[in-house]
């Protein structure tokens, strides 16, 4: 995968040289290029200006972005504009992006964008219902979530498939050594070696956690018959005061 990032602050992306994203680059699975669009700005390198019609703040000018895009060698890239007014970013969107060969992220700054910039864009995406100083942190988050889904980036291909949200549910609790730490013991079922009991326990815990913490996810979740039976049992137990 090839990723191009348009930003005023390329140095902010240093964390992408480490961890999973850095390893993907080392394996030759990922190529990232940073483009400071101030380098393409006319008018004394100014990238912003006052909005027509008045108003507070400054807008990112179209010219530096257009000229930077013209300089990028890309065939049919997915062009993502980081914008708090965009569609919310979700795991399913990361899975979709992981299938692309070329991605371009446009990181804004200031009050907003000249509307004409959006003619270059295929997707307007928001990290959430809040406003950041710039799009860099949002872009890094989306890139990390996407790159880890590229085949062969993670050690085990199945490891991301059980992550929270990948299945549509939150992930079940997990434990490692020691068995007993400060009086907190690993659930007996995980020590039993009985694979079917462990599978059912994990399913129940995943459904329960999702119901308690993110019930909105269950509104569109496609329950199997087995999950529906377990979920009904969970709701019944909770209504009777079960913890």
Swiss-Prot record:
Specifically methylates guanosine-37 in various tRNAs. It comes from Streptococcus equi subsp. equi (strain 4047). Keywords: Cytoplasm, Methyltransferase, S-adenosyl-L-methionine, Transferase, tRNA processing. It holds the Pfam family tRNA_m1G_MT. It is found in: Cytoplasm. Belongs to the RNA methyltransferase TrmD family. The gene is trmD. GO terms for biological process: tRNA N1-guanine methylation. This is tRNA (guanine-N(1)-)-methyltransferase.
């Amino acid at each position: 995968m090839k990723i191009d990032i348009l930003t005023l602050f390329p140095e902010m992306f240093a964390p992408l040289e480490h961890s999973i994203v850095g390893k993907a680059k080392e394996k030759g699975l990922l190529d990232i290029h940073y483009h400071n669009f101030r380098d393409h700005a006319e008018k004394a390198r100014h990238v912003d200006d006052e909005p027509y019609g008045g108003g507070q703040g400054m807008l990112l000018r179209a010219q530096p972005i257009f000229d930077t895009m013209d300089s990028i060698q890309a065939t049919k890239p997915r062009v993502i504009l980081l914008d708090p007014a965009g569609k919310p970013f979700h795991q399913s969107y990361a899975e979709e992006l992981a299938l692309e060969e070329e991605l371009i992220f446009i990181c804004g700054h200031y009050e907003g964008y000249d509307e004409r910039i959006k003619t270059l864009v295929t997707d307007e995406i928001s990290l959430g219902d809040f406003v950041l100083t710039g799009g860099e942190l949002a872009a890094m988050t989306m890139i990390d979530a996407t790159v880890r889904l590229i085949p062969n980036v993670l050690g085990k291909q199945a490891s991301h498939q059980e992550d929270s949200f990948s299945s549509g549910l939150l992930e079940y609790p997990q434990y490692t050594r020691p068995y007993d730490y400060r009086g907190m013991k690993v659930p007996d079922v995980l020590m039993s070696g009985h694979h079917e009991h462990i599978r059912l326990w994990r399913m129940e815990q995943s459904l329960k956690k999702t119901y308690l913490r993110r019930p909105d996810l269950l509104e569109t979740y496609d329950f199997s018959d087995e999950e529906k039976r377990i979920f009904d049992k969970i709701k019944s137990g909770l209504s009777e005061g079960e913890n």
